[in-house]
């Protein structure tokens, strides 16, 4: 028989006393179940007793030795423990203990065990593949695992939970200005400039911006559509509006096109010359002069395109952080979500996309800039009579719908119907966490990828 260490004996004693309190006192049982899980117990018998107490409390608001013992027998657990063990546990609960302190002890032991496992496996990963992985990729993977440990082991603490509404109203939170200070600043701005204060970046399309500012700091924005609707063109158009009209810095990461192809799209947009003409050299000398002058227009602007040879999520996140830190980008565009690969093993592609979506949302919040990601829609759109997209059409994962702050759909009637008015694109804001949902119409030149304000009726 293996002799127990003093440390292990102390741990089992604490488990024993904590469960004894839960067996004897209903209010203590609720505290134990709320703040611990079966993973906090080393002894298998203690794990089972905890789970039994939890299940009993879900069905009724009472606890007793007899109820626990009935459940033990019903689940055929009486071979590994006797009713005398429960009685002994209950009798020892009369000894006064600091329940909060003992719960904290179990929690810290559990976290220490997870950290030890993490450090051991991380060391093995590091030594198994020396110099074969980017150190930054490893750092991101380690950070991801630590974040997982933190999320899994966070639990309701007994003190200092939350801040009062008045505290946030008057003094803010996490280093931010107070709510009243922010509201006062917006009022002063409106009074001084006689125009509305904009808490974010404009898209450059008044029919969108007058309804809602979708490019707010920390927003995860998804532009979704079926192929040929103009997703990439719309993203480039918004990026150009930010760079040329607002003087902002923008990052563009494309997993689908090379930097040269993106720049050709930009030239087509600004010169109003079709991409096909540019490819064939089929344009006049005047058009060539116009194209050459675009270089002067773009000189000194801050439109950064990443030459992304990897589709790995961690690499993409590294690039985004570097663009924010070194180039000071005000917005990031990613084309497109379904081409991103995750380093985490997932049961299926749907779960992988869900993880990518969660990480992109976290990235937007971390960098405090709008992260605009393009996304495909499923073929279900084609099965409907009007072909009009909706949230359930988001491809591969409903998690995108949950994570995104704003979801915009692009819909072109003329793509599906010869009778529809040519050159119109409906922009549908299907989700807007901080504003209203609406739709508007823009003119779209599919040859140049240029979107413009639509004055006439849809």
UniProtKB/Swiss-Prot annotation:
Gene3D superfamilies documented for this protein: DNAb Helicase, Chain A, P-loop containing nucleotide triphosphate hydrolases
BP GO annotations: DNA replication, synthesis of primer
Catalytic activity: Couples ATP hydrolysis with the unwinding of duplex DNA at the replication fork by translocating in the 5'-3' direction. This creates two antiparallel DNA single strands (ssDNA). The leading ssDNA polymer is the template for DNA polymerase III holoenzyme which synthesizes a continuous strand; ATP + H2O = ADP + phosphate + H(+)
Binding site for ATP: 225-232
Top-level taxon of the source organism: Bacteria
GO MF annotations in UniProt: ATP binding; ATP hydrolysis activity; DNA binding; DNA helicase activity
Recorded GO CC terms: cytosol; primosome complex
Domain SF4 helicase, chain residue ranges per copy: 194-458
Keywords for the protein's UniProt record, in alphabetical order: ATP-binding, DNA replication, DNA-binding, Helicase, Hydrolase, Isomerase, Nucleotide-binding, Plasmid, Primosome
Listed EC numbers: 5.6.2.3
Assembly, per entry: Homohexamer.
Role, per record: A replicative DNA helicase, it participates in initiation and elongation during DNA replication. Travels ahead of the DNA replisome, separating dsDNA into templates for DNA synthesis. A processive ATP-dependent 5'-3' DNA helicase it has DNA-dependent ATPase activity.
Family of this protein: Belongs to the helicase family. DnaB subfamily.
Official protein name in the record: Probable plasmid replicative DNA helicase
Organism: Chlamydia psittaci (Chlamydophila psittaci)
């Amino acid at each position: 028989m293996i002799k127990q260490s003093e440390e292990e004996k102390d741990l089992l004693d604490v488990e024993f006393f904590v469960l004894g309190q839960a067996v004897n006192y209903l209010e203590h049982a609720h505290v134990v179940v709320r703040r611990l899980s079966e993973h906090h117990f080393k002894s298998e018998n203690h794990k089972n007793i905890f789970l039994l107490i939890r299940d009993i409390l879900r069905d009724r608001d009472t606890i007793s030795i007899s109820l626990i013992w009935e459940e033990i027998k019903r689940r055929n657990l009486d071979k590994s423990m006797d009713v005398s063990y429960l009685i002994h546990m209950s009798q020892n609960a009369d000894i006064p203990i600091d329940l909060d302190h003992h719960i904290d002890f179990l929690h810290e032991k559990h976290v220490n065990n997870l950290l030890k496992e993490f450090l051991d496996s991380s060391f093995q990963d590091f030594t198994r593949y020396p110099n074969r992985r980017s150190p930054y990729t490893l750092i991101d993977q380690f950070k991801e695992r630590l974040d997982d440990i933190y999320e899994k082991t966070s639990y309701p603490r007994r003190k200092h939970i939350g801040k009062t509404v008045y505290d946030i109203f008057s003094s803010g939170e996490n280093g931010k200005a107070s709510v009243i200070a922010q509201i006062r600043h917006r009022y002063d701005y409106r009074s001084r400039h006689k125009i509305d204060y904009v808490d974010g970046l404009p898209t450059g399309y008044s029919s969108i911006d007058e309804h809602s500012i979708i490019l707010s700091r920390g927003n995860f924005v998804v532009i979704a559509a079926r192929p040929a609707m103009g997703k990439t063109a719309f993203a480039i158009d918004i990026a150009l509006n930010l760079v040329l009209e607002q003087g902002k810095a923008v990052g563009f990461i494309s997993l689908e096109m090379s930097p040269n192809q993106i720049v050709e799209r930009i030239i087509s947009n600004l010169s109003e010359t079709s991409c096909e003409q540019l490819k064939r050299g089929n344009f006049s000398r005047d058009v060539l002069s116009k194209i050459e002058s675009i270089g002067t227009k773009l000189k000194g602007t801050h439109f950064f395109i990443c030459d992304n040879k990897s589709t790995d999520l961690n690499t993409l996140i590294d690039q985004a952080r570097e663009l924010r830190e070194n180039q000071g980008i005000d917005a990031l565009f990613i084309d497109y979500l379904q081409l991103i690969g995750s380093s985490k093993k997932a049961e299926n592609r749907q779960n992988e996309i869900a993880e990518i979506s969660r990480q992109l949302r976290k990235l937007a919040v971390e960098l405090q800039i709008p992260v605009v990601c393009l996304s495909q829609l499923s073929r279900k759109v084609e099965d409907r009579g009007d072909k009009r997209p909706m949230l359930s059409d988001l491809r591969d994962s409903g998690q995108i719908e949950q994570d995104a702050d704003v979801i915009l759909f692009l819909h072109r009637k003329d793509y599906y119907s010869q009778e529809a008015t040519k050159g119109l694109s409906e922009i549908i804001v299907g989700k807007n966490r901080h504003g209203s949902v609406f739709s508007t119409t823009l003119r779209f030149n599919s040859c140049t990828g240029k979107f413009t304000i639509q004055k006439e009726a849809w």
